[in-house]
Amino acid sequence: MEWNGLKMIISTMEPQVSNGPTSNTSNGPSSNNRNCPSPMQTGATTDDSKTNLIVNYLPQNMTQEEFRSLFGSIGEIESCKLVRDKITGQSLGYGFVNYIDPKDAEKAINTLNGLRLQTKTIKVSYARPSSASIRDANLYVSGLPKTMTQKELEQLFSQYGRIITSRILVDQVTGVSRGVGFIRFDKRIEAEEAIKGLNGQKPSGATEPITVKFANNPSQKSSQALLSQLYQSPNRRYPGPLHHQAQRFRLDNLLNMAYGVKRLMSGPVPPSACPPRFSPITIDGMTSLVGMNIPGHTGTGWCIFVYNLSPDSDESVLWQLFGPFGAVNNVKVIRDFNTNKCKGFGFVTMTNYDEAAMAIASLNGYRLGDRVLQVSFKTNKAHKS
């Protein structure tokens, strides 16, 4: 079957409890906490509801081009949008994809829902049409204990209704909670009940009462300004341009979850495949590579050659394999002109050298189905197609 290898990978993935909502949000949460539409409820019948998808829990450093490339591998897209904060320009971690063919939308859900990208497990579901009952259901919570986890925050608020998403703001340098969070309910009336029940109350472990109010209240403009300062503060962990900093954060996250990558594999991975420290070339030293003839290096990133793919393999399989290691620019499976079947190899272009090298170290020799993959940086030698 065409999707056997892909389904095998999805079935071995473990959901991210820390990034996900409570278990009753089966229709898909939204990872944004301001002005974010909720996922569509089951049973919608409009034509748009069959082609329009909402994608949650995207890596914050994923670009519009990477977003389009991922979902474009499924079928023809009419439109797609990665939603960004209007003040900071930062991705809010969710987006929308509208396919031309409803079958492609359904295929995208079946294929990409649960896909592990970097440190995130994305959620793909039908987008729910907006209505008065679901608007303005997002709450701003301050005064939270610094030790409170996202799961504990959800447990505190879940008694008032179905939680779509939750978030606790943390210091970008120390990782310590700022005592501020967001909760988005399925309906506004649930949010109103939570305000009545929790505003001014002391949750377990708190020394002061918490403040609970609607996040989109005009008085919350100051909190948006604070968020803007978080991203623009000169006290950043890494000096230099912001896009370089983002790539270093990607590497930090990658190293932190390196051993967790093994859960995606169908077979054991030796410890040497996921070393605790792996940085042959840092992003800060990339400028020294200009003009050098380095295997795999292209104008858009680092090209990886993947050999011994099965005839039924397609681009989605490559996304599944390489997505957990870092930012993937594009993937390509080389197909036979007559049969349209995979000729046994393909290419993956990744933005960052460290992440590409980690992917090669982990996936070279990996058994996918009944085949052992050969993975390496692409050399200048052209592969016949």
Curated annotation (Swiss-Prot):
GO cellular-component term (any): growth cone
User: Ranges of Low complexity compositional bias?
Assistant: 18-33
Reported tissue expression? Expressed in pancreatic beta cells (at protein level). Expressed in the brain.
Show the ranges annotated as biased composition (Polar residues). Answer: 34-48
Give positions of region: Disordered: 12-48
**Gene Ontology molecular function, alphabetical:** mRNA 3'-UTR AU-rich region binding; mRNA 3'-UTR binding; poly(A) binding; pre-mRNA intronic pyrimidine-rich binding
Q: Where is the RRM domain?
A: 51-129, 137-217, 302-380
Mark the residues carrying the PTM Omega-N-methylarginine. 248
Q: Where is the protein found, in the record's own terms? A: Cytoplasm; Perikaryon; Cell projection, Dendrite; Cell projection, Axon
| Asymmetric dimethylarginine carried by residues | 248
Recount the PTM note: Methylated by CARM1, which leads to reduced RNA-binding activity and enhanced interaction with SMN. Methylation at Arg-248 by CARM1 weakens protective binding to the 3'UTR of CDKN1A mRNA and down-regulates CDKN1A protein expression, thereby maintaining cells in a proliferative state. Methylation is inhibited by NGF, which facilitates neurite outgrowth.
Q: Which Pfam families match?
A: RRM_1 (PF00076)
Description of its domains: The RRM 3 domain is required for binding to poly(A) RNA, for the association with polysomes and with the EIF4F cap-binding complex and for the stimulation of translation. The RRM 1 and RRM 2 domains may contribute to polysome association and stimulation of translation.
Q: What does this protein do?
A: RNA-binding protein that is involved in the post-transcriptional regulation of mRNAs. Plays a role in the regulation of mRNA stability, alternative splicing and translation. Binds to AU-rich element (ARE) sequences in the 3' untranslated region (UTR) of target mRNAs, including GAP43, VEGF, FOS, CDKN1A and ACHE mRNA. Many of the target mRNAs are coding for RNA-binding proteins, transcription factors and proteins involved in RNA processing and/or neuronal development and function.
Question: Per its UniProt record, what NCBIfam families does this chain match?
Answer: ELAV_HUD_SF
Protein name per Swiss-Prot or TrEMBL: ELAV-like protein 4
Protein source organism: Homo sapiens
